[in-house]
Amino acid sequence: SLVEVMDRCSSPMGARMLRTWLSMPVMDLQELESRYAVVQHFIDNRDDLMRLQTMIGDIGDLERIISRAAAGKIMPREVMQLRRGLSQTEPIMKLCGGKGVEALDELISKMGDCAELLEYLGRTMHPETASQLGKGDVIAAGVNEELDELRRIARHGKDYLLEVQQREIERTGIPSLKIGFNNVFGYYLEVRNTHKESVPEEWIRKQTLVNAERYITEELKEYEQKILGAEERIYAIEVQIYAELVAKIQANIAMIQKNCRILSHLDVLSGFADLAISN
């Protein structure tokens, strides 16, 4: 078909725009001349053409991702694809702008600035994000203090308990002190009878054994509550932050869609240049 012959686009977005152009040919002479000027520029500057096609190829199908964002159905890895795609915007603007081609400059001047959104996405999303919420880390470290602490507790609980144990040994001077757990009253500090006189006043005695006493502290009770509900709370926090992130993307949809149209335009015209060179 004619589309198959002419399609040298580097992205699905460009391929869709090409089909639209072929099904509804433009009749405006000025628009045709503008398109031709851009095509001729890339025919004459083949290094720029190859670089542009590579960049556009790396963008992927931003239109599809944005449509999912608008519906609130965008998945975490699609957010990362969106970020990777948008990150090509500035290099493309630098590559194509200031070349002395009025039509090209006009296209580039209409592109929106993605820097703020890119910075936000990069700061908020985990660099190796899970495929969906609840299946691993989605939100980056450093975004939410409670989330960071809960992750540390959930994944390094034993290390944390050893830290508490060592700290209390040093503080009280009780070398045999150890931390344990049972289903009756949770985490406890166990002290042998020979050292029970060294127990701090704020410790609460919970159980007396033949040779030892067991105590609880406010710190251990707080830790217990955190670790037992850590995964559930981690999920809740990530859901909340991710919803805010999706809302941020949705607030920028108009700008992203405009950029997609311009990138599609460049994709089609660079494809025409590629076709002209090879034929």
Feature roles, as predicted:
Residues 1-279:
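Alpha-helical coupling/stalk and coiled-coil linker elements that connect catalytic or binding modules
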